[in-house]
Regions:
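Single conserved hydrophobic/aromatic residue that forms the stacking wall/gate
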Residues: 164-171
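Class I SAM-dependent methyltransferase core
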Residues: 27
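Conserved SAM-binding loop of SAM-dependent methyltransferases across substrates and taxa
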Residues: 34-42
Length: 171
């Protein structure tokens, strides 16, 4: 998924720099999850974290409720009016289920220009074309702990001597 500050171009290099052995992998500033999704799953304890609650909710719904999420996305329209309505609802923190909020947020990312969530991108996009990606992400996230914490609190909770920490500031 496109995300501001994403590590798509660097993911291969980052994974090659991992030590041969580590017990924990903590994605401190998770964003689009490019490194986590590129890293082969193993026996290590994995944590994905991001401070953006909408993004974390989306990944939790992908992991825990993929069928409900895909159903909520099945018949959405690709229109500027819907984009504006969704953006407004999320900005107002309108009451909605976690799945509905995840579906809205995913629509906002997919329909916005450069995934920036601020302007309608006007490119037609059939959400159903992403269902296989949602299913793949669901399988990959099955054993991943997903957190929505400030990075200092996250590190205090999870960091131990054998942790492989990936924070973009260290690269």
């Amino acid at each position: 998924m496109s995300w501001i500050g994403g590590k798509k171009a660097l993911r291969e290099l980052i994974v090659r720099l991992f030590p041969l052995y580590y017990e924990r992998y903590i994605e401190v500033f998770g964003g689009g999850g490019w490194v986590l999704f590129h890293k082969p799953p193993g026996n290590d304890f994995e944590v994905y974290n991001d401070f953006n609650g909408l993004l974390v909710n989306l990944y939790r719904c992908v992991r825990d409720k993929p069928e409900e999420l895909m159903e909520a996305l099945r018949y959405v329209l690709n229109a500027r009016e819907d984009f504006d309505r969704i953006r407004s609802a999320l900005a107002r923190d309108s009451p909605a289920s976690d799945v509905q909020r995840a579906a809205w947020f995913y629509q906002l990312i997919r329909y916005s220009y450069a995934s920036g969530q601020t302007s309608f991108g006007s490119q037609p996009h059939d959400m159903r074309s992403n269902f296989s990606l949602i299913e793949q992400a669901h399988r990959r996230l099955a054993k991943v702990v997903i957190e929505n914490k400030d990075f200092e609190k996250l590190l205090h909770q999870y960091a131990v001597s054998y942790t492989h920490l990936r924070a973009h500031e260290t690269l």
